[in-house]
């Protein structure tokens, strides 16, 4: 039986959808003109002007530090615009006490209360201190300096040690001893990273020496990607949700106009109205017999605070009735959420391990990856039936390891750090890791298998699985465009790629990141209406846009440093949504995860 939670009156889908479409058009009538100059009186373009509340909105924290389930909350929406060639930007006034923060690489940050703005230009002072200039750069600029004298080991490090958080961010570039790095890597391996045994042994001393050198010579940190003057047309809105113990992993823009965000560490779904900043939290109740930490109870043993029974990962909307399906990675089930009644329903599986990313097909079937059992799953809602498709193994040893995975995690749950005792090779034998998934217009399900450098298709009629080797490493998540082509992120290659099924050809595209090759794109999505690809700049505090027709790139910097994003959603009007999803969230500049909305123009 579904579990129901008392809820506000259901919204009318079409009305709410219309509200989202005008989210960025609905601002207070009074806009404050901002003019920014340098010390010589010259206009300063591409200054990020952020409107921030003087104090965060008061929200309910009665449920272990979070809002009570089904109790509406009101957050303060933050907003950022960029100055034009004349150094000017208009900032809509807020209805609460607010301030602005000015940020531009090469200049000192400034903050002013709204009451102190006046009519005179604001002067930004140039920054000359090498250490301060280095601190302004995003994580990718810092991580680009890492040199192990072994390019393959560096790529492996960026693949395995960038899974959950940035490399080169403020927390990960501090000077530490080799022993401290060794302890951190052991903890990371218990969380599930597959850094090779060789890397686990050699990298701690290399990191100790490297960051000691960089902190002694901060001028070695290069500049990040330049901010383009076209940013003057963009608006970025940001809504704080959750806290430093949250992880806002994936999100879904629903046809009812709401954005749904899953807190992976606290088993809560946030239902957000992006037009107003109002949101409601719905806590997923554990089933009888569920244990804290689920089937991976030992994984979060060292984490200070979590309520993870499910481990919310991916969300997708049914094309039939608008219900939301969720992958709970720490269980053998799918979770169904009715946005109108607010009821949760559980669909149990008797096999498979770690349900990961999911998508619907046109027949209202749910396709999903099972990351640790090397399978693709399909749930037929009409028949109430699961079908699992086995993917091939690379070796007998891998087959044995995958079959033993549930037992290995049981040992971890008993406090035995078996992951730290197992020998790991450079290609992660034993954990092939089927990851992202999408369905092309012809009905085929396509997956990316991260550790084997492959994509695969599943024919729903015949059940045939076809494996295809990629000419790049670490295909992570993928999406289909309107023509049935697949767009894939190459995580540690700092690229995206297009695969054309009709020809079997790959087209590889470098991200426009500076320094070249320094980003780790986690995911992407395709705006089919505008024929554009939006890409997570996961290690660079940015989101990229690639226009397929013109082959032009754009880059949109985020307001907070250490904005680690994992997913992209696109509205019918072209707004783009991401979440700041670092694990842990206290790595974020102010330790505050957010829902972010980008309007390009």
Tell me what each language-model feature is.
Residues 32-45, 64:
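Structural motif
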Residues 55-92:
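Short, acidic Ser/Thr/Gly-rich low-complexity loop/linker segments typical of extracellular
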Residues 76, 98-113:
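A short, solvent-exposed loop/turn motif at the edges and junctions
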Residues 157-168, 203:
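The canonical Cys-X-X-Cys-His
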Residues 244-255, 288-319, 351-363, 395-441, ...:
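Beta-rich, blade/repeat-based domains predominating
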Residues 259-265, 308-310, 318, 324-330, ...:
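Conserved beta-strand positions in repeat-built beta-propeller and related beta-rich domains
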Residues 273-277, 338-342, 380-384, 459-463, ...:
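Short loop/turn segments that connect beta-strands within beta-propeller blades
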Residues 565-601:
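Blade-level signature of beta-propeller repeat domains, shared across WD40, Kelch, NHL, RCC1
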